[in-house]
């Protein structure tokens, strides 16, 4: 039996989980600050603020200009932002984001947000743009109820949200006001889910191991009647013949885990199927024996980004009570070099019986995902399986940091993904699933498949490899390579660090099932 690893001997997990556990940042008391939007033609969503709006236009603002007013209209800080001529979901997200960042930098603790006609997007922009994560001592002090943090324990008290939001209602009509409040709260929940994915990806790898990721999942849903969490150990993994996961884990002192999370959002019937969600869970990827360059290797703490995205999506489904039955699985391990690590040239037999030659140990994600995809597509009656992974550097080369690369089998699933990504304000680009890429992986004389190809198109051959392990070959399936969008900032509501994309697209897809 493997050891538990240095981190579990020196670190009190429950301390950090108090910071990681999401909280819906909905303010319950009057806000100290306000975001107020005006149109280019000087129209304002609420005439109650006409006087300060007139002062704003006296400064001859340009489009998207933000002015900060102090101690006016009952608020300590009031930020006025001018919207674009054509108001849209995206422009509202952007306006709320920019204004919220200014208010936060000027000491705001609670912000009332003008709904601007799109209250959900106003909430998203404000809550996403003001996210941050740090384990610096001076940063951690803001989490505490007391002003002084004890030397012995940086996490002496539960971490409250440092910034909360409430909707500035612009209507006296009760039904409309309720609908706007509900939409605003949905935006905050979706933002909290994406921010959760960000935090899990940001968490240092000595804290976010396979064991601790599972511990966190159990904590996250411990009070939920709709979610069941199953943590499978090394013995179970061996019984399941998940040799891809066991082989990648061979170089690590921390044992692997296979996490299975069921969300029951509606009553089951004979005709209903599961929405299968699979996420890559490599908690740190050094490349193994085929070791990566040391520059920027620390970013590989986020190689479990697929697992973080899918777990956070399940959290959102549960919070929003979306009527769908979804199952999320992730194989969790580190990929490290050691005397017992897998070597180039090794041959293993996968869960579905196919033999695979390991030509490059840094192409480990597809090995563990192959077993996971086969498990979920064989053990569950799935109507579709969506897998997300920070899989290939080739994806960054192909699409940069703008689009998630989507390899999709099934036109209906692609249509749903494309529509969902548009609704979420995310960007997807369809990539080719073609048998020609698979042929490039069958050149080994020792095994059915090789885990890499020498012919280029690395993101395409990786997708073709994973597809081989579907239990039903015609099953609707999407492989989302999120390596390019893992930590790149694209919009004004993004911030430094990991992106948490594409959590909100997964939520939108689930709504359509």
Curated annotation (Swiss-Prot):
One Pfam family from the record: Peptidase_M17
CDD domains (UniProt xref): Peptidase_M17 (cd00433)
GO molecular function: aminopeptidase activity; manganese ion binding; metalloaminopeptidase activity; peptidase activity
EC number: 3.4.11.-
Tree of life domain: Eukaryota
This protein's GO CC annotations: cytoplasm
Name this protein carries in UniProt: Putative aminopeptidase C13A11.05
Organism for this UniProt entry: Schizosaccharomyces pombe (strain 972 / ATCC 24843) (Fission yeast)
Lineage: Eukaryota, Fungi, Dikarya, Ascomycota, Taphrinomycotina
